[in-house]
UniProtKB/Swiss-Prot annotation:
Gene: secA
Cofactor binding mode and count: May bind 1 zinc ion per subunit.
Subunit-level organization: Monomer and homodimer. Part of the essential Sec protein translocation apparatus which comprises SecA, SecYEG and auxiliary proteins SecDF-YajC and YidC.
Subcellular location: Cell inner membrane; Cytoplasm
GO MF entries: ATP binding; metal ion binding; protein-exporting ATPase activity
EC number(s) stated in the UniProt entry for this protein: 7.4.2.8
Main localization category: membrane
Keyword Cell membrane: yes
Organism: Pseudoalteromonas translucida (strain TAC 125)
Protein name: Protein translocase subunit SecA
Amino acid sequence: MISNLFTKIFGSRNDRTIKNLRKTVALINALETQLEALSDDDLKAKTAEFRERYDNGQSLDDLLPEAFAVVREASKRVNGMRHFDVQLLGGMVLHQGRIAEMRTGEGKTLTATLPAYLNGLTGKGVHVITVNDYLAKRDAETNRPLFEFLGLTVGCNVPGMMPQQKKQAYVADITYGTNNEFGFDYLRDNMAFSIDERVQRPLFYAVVDEVDSILIDEARTPLIISGPAEDSSELYTEINTMVPLLELQEKEDEEGIEGDGDFTIDEKSKQVHLTERGQIKVEELLTERGLIAEGDSLYSAASITLLSHVYAALRAHKLYQKDVDYVVKENEVIIIDEHTGRSMEGRRWSEGLHQAVEAKEGVNIQNENQTLASITFQNYFRLYETLAGMTGTADTEAFEFQSIYGLDTVVMPTNKPMVRDDRADLVYLTQEEKYEAILVDIKDCQERGQPVLVGTISIESSEYLSQFLRKEKIKHNVLNAKFHAQEADIVSDAGLPGTVTIATNMAGRGTDIVLGGNWHSEVEKLENPTDEQIAEIKAAWKIRHDAVIDAGGLHIIGTERHESRRIDNQLRGRSGRQGDAGSSRFYLSMDDALMRIFAGERMTNMMRKLGMQRGEAIEHPWVNRAIENAQRKVEARNFDVRKQLLEYDDVANDQRRVVYSQRNELLEEGDISETITVIRGDVLSNIIDQYIAPQSLAEMWDVPGLEERLKQDFLIELPITQWLADDNKLYEEKLRERIEESVGQAYKQKEEMVGDSVLRQFEKAIMLQSLDQHWKDHLAAMDHLRQGIHLRGYAQKNPKQEYKRESFELFAEMLENLKIDVVSILSKVQVRAEEDVEKVEEQHRKSENAPREYQHEEVEHVGGEAPQSATVMARSEPKVGRNDPCPCGSGQKFKQCCGKLK
């Protein structure tokens, strides 16, 4: 009550932010007349002037009013489009490293040109990140003439480009591209074998379009580069035959009463669990097939991999549906993005799930993969010095943006008032009744010449509805992953009078639906359009546009509520752009997934008791509130999953930063002989300690064992027993020095034989090869650790703390093994000439260039307690001093821990 009173008197925080920014808008507007008087050449010269002023110490904030005014004037001349005041406000919010929530049709693409130009003046590179290749190419081509007029270069970064093309794209002042491609390039750069193979520059400034889709929806799915591992396709086929023999237990066991099924399903977390009866049955089936020994348990160390195969097969059959979660195309299983409804070719589920789905569908089973490199979007985007984003729907997730990325959300006012009529939801008992009501609504709109966009949450729903409309002979277009290629044409026609378009979720997002149809696409179809033809097309469009406005604008029909309110709002947001007329309504049934999981049987029974007749619907604010509460529950759970994923990945991220930073230093240094000497000293000291314990009596020394070990690891025979017999005063310290000196001399002789430059090159090649191999193995070990870490909760231990402790131990062990490997290889190998070095480099390149897959992992709920506090975004990383605490969290000094490698 009191907070509402204060808001009314002083305005909300958002209102105050907008009010302050409007002062700068007034300054920009005041410059317009002055800039209009400039010639094209004088306007172009402004870029060089701004760069000079920036180099002389002026900040970008000082240049902002003039720079924005110049971009607006250039846009008027090049594109014939003038930035509205709300777009100037949005540009300022983006420059400040915040999220601008701008409604559909408010011109986000044009808004992004303002901060992109301003930050592009630094020459450090600006990344404009979109959700798909089509939008990246479209926006780059649309804005290229504007930026080139102002003297800035534009690049486009999409999949399938050659390394040289990628380099050129990244060297540009402004680079458009997809979130996946920027992330994969970062991982590839950190797998490069030479500096020349790297393409990215240091990450400076990024504007993320559809920021909610990229930083929220896709944040649960890490980017993974993987390579093929062992072939186990026969095992998947064998286990696939077992699933039909297992029975579902409809209800959980109650108060010790044993159920009558083999497994249970948890729809909320997309998991299956074997019952005690199911475990016994699976063991019998595996024994029959000769996969485990008689009497062996499913949970024994030898059978634990079989257990993961069984769970993968059960999930594939019972939780993943064809045409909802994936499609089968050309003998291949292709994942469907649950948020956009698009097919994601090339992406695969991990942990054997994709192979299990392939076995279920009877298509070719591709090999499992080994992770070579991975990063979450949360940790990738936090590498940028400044991160900003824009979307039509961010306010519902403002807390998550702030707590995880440190990004404030500012809601932009619309250029024209919003007049869309958002009607209350209608809830029916059955799906059949719901679809009948939708049909009546569509027919009514079509008769009045009102275009309709029907949003579904899966391909299956869109095809069911399409079949329903075909029976009624209603002409319509379908926009889903199966018709991805025709997307642009379907969207451009969606605003025509009486047109019915069915779209999965937010397919076609990023492209505005223009009332009356898109006249630009009509002009583009003509080879050499004359002014008269264009005028005719525009006149015809104006008649259609006015007819659609009179009919009520674009009508949105939602066939189901999504688990996120934001995605429902995105669907609604397709209508009512730029003050246009429009309307929206959601039709629900008690059979819908969200209603079934959260409303349950109680509400269905209540509706039946109320004596609802067939075709009758409930329409009440209470129902809307109940649905919103259900959505909030799902959103809260998904937020916990993302936050938890981040906390676990932060542990790996600290290690990733250490490894990648040392790898980059290795690439940049021509001579790493000092590092090799230090490593050799450490390894040798540890080996000697094992056989000659520090400050121990000579009688306790294992001298023959030490001689044998040195022969094995360093290929050097030292007569230590003879040295001790010849010199009674050869104590421990002097003996150590003599051994180290002898090993060093042997290495020096190798250097003299081969040549200094050849050995330096060989050292670097071996160091890189060993580091990459150990890092891959470490990633696999970390994966296995995380999969089972939640079980520590049963032992009253905090899974996260246990994960941190054990992952640090694994990391320390990896560094030690790496040192031993490097020293051992360099000591043993016989390098005769430069060709040997080239052979090692070529061998490494071949292994690195083996077929790779770029994918999003299907993330499980990692278990453990919910994190107490979220990590706030750090925009820059200070250099870690050798005596500072190690960033990996061990509590040791950096030089005694991860810094040992350096």
